[in-house]
Regions:
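Ser/Thr/Pro/Gly-biased, low-complexity, turn-/loop-rich segments
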Residues: 2, 20-182
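Bacterial N-terminal signal peptides that target proteins for export
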Residues: 1-7
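Bacterial N-terminal signal peptides
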Residues: 8-17
Length: 182
């Protein structure tokens, strides 16, 4: 009995830590704004004709949706889009529509400079610069691990900001790894 209790007390902080990390990630993604290149699906419970699967958003980031017509998705969160569709269907077509929007695929981030395989890569929730470099094949021999810059897609000034390898990467970000001279 004592062994089981000791094991439970030892394991509990780890389990709670994992839950907290997942909750923090989910919270960050709840603020995620849709944009060109994202792939989304829309479902309305019990209404198969209103289901739209894996729609890749174009540069205009609009979709044609039954009953509602053209809907602009760019800059909206999943919650905002669900509310927009729910409000549009409620009363006109359904009494209490249950709308679910899922992001199937996030738009890419880009990495260049002293990287083995520069280019665009699909974003993954929880992505850091370190993980992005790994996805791109790692640093080249002459890469500076301290001179790493990000241009954030959502920054109106498009300013290049110096970051470390633990910095968070967002969809649409451009990462540049500079060359080390020594």
């Amino acid at each position: 009995m004592f062994r089981r209790l000791a094991l439970l007390l030892f394991a509990l902080p780890g389990v709670l830590g994992i839950g907290a990390a997942a909750q923090e990630r989910d919270s960050a993604l709840s603020n995620y704004r849709l944009g060109s290149g994202d792939v989304v699906s829309v479902q309305v419970l019990g209404e198969e004709e209103l289901r739209r699967e894996k729609i890749r958003l174009s540069d205009a980031a609009t979709i044609s949706y039954p009953i509602l017509g053209e809907i602009r998705l760019a800059g909206k969160t999943v919650g905002e889009l669900e509310k927009l569709i729910r409000d549009g269907l409620q009363g006109r077509y359904l009494l209490n529509p249950q709308v679910t929007v899922t992001i199937n695929e996030y738009r890419s981030f880009f990495i260049n400079g002293q990287i083995e395989r520069p280019g665009g890569y699909p974003f993954q929730p929880g992505l850091t610069v370190r993980k992005a470099v790994s996805l791109a094949g790692g640093f080249k021999e002459r890469a500076s691990k301290e001179k790493i810059f990000i241009i954030r897609e959502d920054d109106p000034k498009q300013a290049s900001t110096r970051v470390d390898q633990n910095a968070t990467v967002n969809p649409g970000d451009i990462i540049t790894v500079e060359e080390s001279f020594f």
